[in-house]
UniProtKB/Swiss-Prot annotation:
Role this protein plays: Catalyzes the conversion of dihydroorotate to orotate with quinone as electron acceptor.
SUPFAM superfamilies the UniProt entry points to: FMN-linked oxidoreductases
Pathway: Pyrimidine metabolism; UMP biosynthesis via de novo pathway; orotate from (S)-dihydroorotate (quinone route): step 1/1
Quaternary structure and partners: Monomer.
Residues annotated for FMN binding in this entry: A61, G62, L63, D64, K65, T85, N138, N171, K216, T244, G267, G296, Y317, S318
Gene: pyrD
Residues given in the record as substrate binding sites: K65, N110, R111, M112, G113, F114, N171, N176, N245, T246
EC number: 1.3.5.2
Required cofactor names: FMN
Cellular component annotations (GO), alphabetically ordered: cytoplasm; plasma membrane
Similarity remark: Belongs to the dihydroorotate dehydrogenase family. Type 2 subfamily.
Protein name in the entry: Dihydroorotate dehydrogenase (quinone)
The organism of origin for this protein: Pseudomonas entomophila (strain L48)
Length: 340
């Protein structure tokens, strides 16, 4: 059924198709239809960050930026749902067109630019949701906030979403907000992590619960840079790392229609680079910090490869666009079939 739906959706512009799909998934969730229309994955519970996941396959941030279809995505069989990236204030993002399909490579290029309705709008939708599973909220900075003041935006979002999130992801790796990726390095990273850790401990005391913090990183760092990030995450007391965001590289899409568009590349071409980052992180972290792997999962076996590389959980986005809900089940089955 999804194959037919995709054929129809792919006749529309990518962003129109995205918005329509979100509306349909959201409506199906409100009516309780999605679980009836989609075969559910087998139960494969796992505990990570002190949280209990129904299965290790989640929705990556970016697909549902405003929390418009939380119930709908959960009913499709995801073991957890991550929404956002959300910023303190609403912002329109970059000019259109800003989303490009490259079906020949099972890939997508986007330069959306954190378009979202703001953190208060997102929280209203979260509180209206009936979903009781693991919900991640991905936070970022506003486009017009100077990078040297980025910490302020992250702290605003952290405080606002704290009581409504199962875990919180700090996005310092989108390539579509100028200067953002500089926060992954050196003193900038240390200062941000220390500020987040300090505020989180204050919130844990005042709210009576400690919400895990994850950092989402890029796949374009050298092994040495990745190792430095791993050390900083452990030193600051972060709870997880998400590897990875989109890549600025164009391997696998050179010469293809839209392959030269600016923005972050996701989908099949980023698989190898992203999984390599997982392996490097696993070697550096030594099991002290869980890894959530995202990037390039377009077949069930790719999810198993991420787990074998050292990840505890996986997330999908572009693969879901191309393969539909069946990919969730395939990924869960592939992980379940791994030797114990």
């Amino acid at each position: 059924m999804y194959t037919l739906a995709r054929q129809l959706l792919f006749k529309l512009s990518p962003e129109t198709s995205h918005d329509l799909s979100l509306d349909l998934i959201g409506a199906g969730g409100r009516l309780g239809l999605n679980g009836l229309l989609c075969k559910q994955p087998a139960a494969l519970p796992v505990s990570v960050m002190g949280l209990n996941f129904a299965n290790p396959v989640g929705l990556a941030a970016g697909l549902d930026k405003n929390g418009a279809a939380i119930d709908g995505f959960a009913q499709l069989g995801f073991g957890f749902v991550e929404i956002g990236t959300v910023t303190p204030r609403p912002q329109p993002g970059n000019p259109k067109p800003r989303l490009f399909r490259i079906p020949e490579a099972t890939a997508i290029i986007n330069r959306m630019g954190f378009n979202n309705l703001g953190v208060d709008n997102l929280l209203a939708r979260v509180r209206a949701s009936k979903y009781s599973g693991v919900l991640g909220i991905n936070i970022g900075k506003n486009f017009d906030t100077p990078v040297e003041r980025a910490q302020d935006d992250y702290l605003i979002c952290l405080e606002k979403v704290y009581n409504d999130a199962s875990y919180i992801t700090v996005n310092v790796s989108s390539p579509n907000t100028p200067g953002l990726r500089s926060l992954q390095f050196g003193d900038s990273l240390k200062q941000l992590l220390d500020a987040l850790a300090e505020r989180r401990e204050q919130l844990a005391v005042s709210n009576g619960k400690r919400v895990p913090l994850a950092i989402k990183i890029a796949p374009d760092m050298s092994d040495e840079e990745t190792a430095l990030v791993a050390a900083a995450l452990m030193e600051s007391g972060m709870d997880a790392v998400i590897a990875t965001n989109t890549t600025l590289g164009r391997e696998g899409v050179e010469g293809l229609p839209f392959g030269g568009e600016a923005g972050g590349l996701s989908g099949a071409p980023v698989l190898e680079k992203s999984t390599h980052t997982v392996k490097v992180l696993a070697g550096e972290l030594g099991g002290k910090l869980p890894i959530i792997a995202a990037g390039g999962i377009t077949e069930g076996r790719h999810a198993a490869e991420k787990i074998a590389a050292g990840a505890s959980l996986v997330q999908i986005y572009s693969g879901f666009i191309y393969k539909g809900p069946a990919l969730i089940r395939e990924a869960v089955d592939a992980i379940a079939a791994m030797p114990r």
